[in-house]
């Protein structure tokens, strides 16, 4: 049964929540004066929930600081404008929802670019023309080709990326840009939460994400964070970069990520090279997007397999092309990590991603180096020039 998703502000009286008859369970974002501070997961919730019941559930289960005595945080200050890039491939319904969420940001001086990657139909351009945004075509298949297309076409000094199946929170752009007032910061990332939990596959993917998010601001810099471990810094669904730094680094590696044999890893590779360059990556939970997780079991399995492929394609690149010994160490340690943690959680009776799904990610890892080699050979034969008009 679908889980009800709510957005609760703790500095004001809590509302009465009414779950639909087909819903069971509550997933609620908790805010303090607009800032995300925690989550409430209440699997048994049904029917009408009074403010007292919701408060009791928050008190019993949510991990929060002592908010009632905490002062209101300072508002996020206005920052330099962003070039917001959405790379998309034949997902018009998702794109429509994403672009609608970006309309207020466009009105606030931010530039929005829609990059149509290897289009097969007119569905994407039909949606894009409904909005006052720039529309670009990148004929070469691959997410990192599309990211680079937007990067080169962007007009502002800061470029932000959001997935086409995500929705931006109203404060997203300002929060993602705010850390760049520090000249040492080269990249920022933010919080990703589920847009819906309507299927079993989405619930299972949420278990996968649970231990990968935090509500604390984080700063990552080498050598404290080895570049080979840069995946801890965030996700490509919600990131921003200094444009000149990204161009200096050569842009995103087109051999990696969706639309290629490696399936993922392009964001992690960029984070690693930002750290190599000596710049800082800042993760801020104030920069929030809501992401539509994969709805079907087949999509979920394909996604997790691709995560394994992309991770080991990235680590293979670090080891073989950049001679980074940390990549080998991290690659070896990874095998015991996720599966061992899931098994331990199950033994303790805690929610955990089923081991057969973690096995999908592990299976993909075996193909990482091979897929990187295949994609390198394939792209060596590709000479199409992108259209950025």
Placement of each model-derived feature along the sequence:
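Short, flexible, basic/aromatic active-site loop/helix in glycosyltransferases
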Residues: 190, 208-231
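A short, conserved alpha-helix in the catalytic core of glycosyltransferases
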Residues: 233-250, 255-287
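Glycine-rich, basic loop-to-helix element that forms the pyrophosphate-binding segment
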Residues: 124, 138-154
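N-proximal low-complexity "stem/linker" segments adjacent to membrane-targeting elements
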Residues: 2-24, 28-40, 44-101
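Short aromatic/hydrophobic "clamp" motif used to bind/position activated sugar donors
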Residues: 159
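Non-catalytic, C-terminal membrane-associated alpha-helical segments of glycosyltransferases
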Residues: 303-309, 323-389
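Short, acidic, metal-binding catalytic loop of nucleotide-sugar glycosyltransferases
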Residues: 100-109
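Conserved donor NDP-sugar-binding/catalytic core segment of glycosyltransferases
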Residues: 171-208
């Amino acid at each position: 049964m679908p889980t009800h998703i709510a957005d609760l502000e703790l500095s004001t009286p809590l509302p009465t929540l009414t779950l639909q008859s087909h819903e069971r369970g509550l997933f609620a974002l908790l805010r303090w004066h607009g800032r995300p501070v925690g989550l409430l997961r209440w699997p048994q919730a049904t029917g009408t929930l009074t403010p007292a019941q919701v408060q009791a559930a928050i008190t019993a289960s949510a991990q929060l600081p002592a908010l009632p005595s905490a002062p209101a945080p300072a508002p996020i200050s206005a920052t330099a404008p962003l070039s917001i890039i959405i790379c998309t491939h034949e997902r018009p319904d998702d794109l429509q929802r994403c672009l609608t969420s970006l309309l207020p940001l466009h009105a606030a001086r931010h530039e929005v670019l829609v990059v149509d990657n290897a289009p097969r139909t007119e569905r994407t351009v039909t949606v894009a023309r409904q909005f006052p945004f720039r529309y670009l075509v990148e004929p070469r298949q691959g997410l990192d080709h599309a990211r680079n297309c937007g990067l080169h076409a962007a007009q502002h000094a800061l470029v932000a990326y959001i997935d086409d199946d995500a929705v931006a929170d109203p404060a997203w752009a300002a929060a993602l840009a705010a850390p760049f007032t520090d000249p040492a910061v080269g990249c920022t990332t933010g919080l990703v939460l589920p847009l819906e939990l309507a299927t079993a596959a989405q619930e299972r993917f949420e278990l996968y994400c649970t231990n990968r998010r935090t509500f604390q601001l984080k700063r990552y810099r080498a050598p404290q964070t080895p570049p080979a471990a840069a995946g801890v810094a965030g996700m490509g669904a919600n990131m921003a970069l200094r444009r000149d730094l990204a161009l200096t680094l050569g842009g995103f590696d087109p051999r990696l990520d969706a639309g290629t044999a490696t399936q993922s890893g392009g964001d992690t590779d960029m984070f690693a090279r930002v750290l190599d360059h000596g710049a800082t990556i800042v993760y801020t939970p104030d920069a929030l997007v809501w992401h539509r997780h994969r709805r079907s079991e087949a999509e979920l399995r394909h996604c997790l397999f691709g995560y394994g492929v992309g991770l080991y394609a990235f680590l293979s690149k670090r080891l073989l092309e950049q001679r980074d010994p940390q990549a080998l160490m991290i690659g070896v340690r990874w095998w015991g990590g996720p599966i061992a943690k899931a098994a331990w959680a199950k033994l303790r009776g805690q929610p955990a991603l089923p081991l057969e799904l973690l096995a999908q990610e592990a299976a993909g890892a075996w193909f990482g180096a091979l897929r990187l080699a295949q994609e390198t050979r394939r792209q060596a034969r590709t000479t199409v020039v992108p259209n950025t008009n």
